[in-house]
């Protein structure tokens, strides 16, 4: 299974089914690919409704006849645009044909900007994905939360955690989150896309390495094999 970081919070998982998380491709200043470069996508996971995460979900879904997995409110919004959806909510899990997805708590917003209006986008979330005997945790956008301690019981293989501060955890809090989650590997994300969310990724790596957690810094377009 190949897991590719495409910048910001975009993660592409290529295996028996191809899954993309938070598909902010167009307009993403650090994404190295264009929409036409993506492989066939079977599922799209959206953590919350902000434009830098909902991104190109509609276009990708329609082009590939892909199913969007997100909260009920986002799925309702996308369903009206002709997109196939599977609605879930925090704490819920479902066994798909590629594996199991569980929605986990996130502390953030989820409003959907539609023209001049802000539409209620439900509650933000993270995803715990179990597939091909591996567990991947994508935190979405979130601050530090005590619920992360429960993930420490899940034997997570790789955790994607935001570290950019301002809107999400900063380096210090992401280190604390890593200590609670106890993943085998951690990949920092949601930093450096814009100056506002600059973070010292090497400091993050140093601190989590001291906790005996492997930190994998992926530049946009780089992959790891699970």
Swiss-Prot record:
Entries under HAMAP family matching the protein: UPF0173 (MF_00457)
Family membership: Belongs to the UPF0173 family.
Protein name (Swiss-Prot/TrEMBL): UPF0173 metal-dependent hydrolase Tpet_1587
Keywords linked to the UniProt accession: Hydrolase
GO MF terms held by the record: hydrolase activity
Gene3D superfamilies: Ribonuclease Z/Hydroxyacylglutathione hydrolase-like (3.60.15.10)
Lipid metabolism keyword on record: no
Pfam families per the UniProt record, alphabetical: Lactamase_B_2
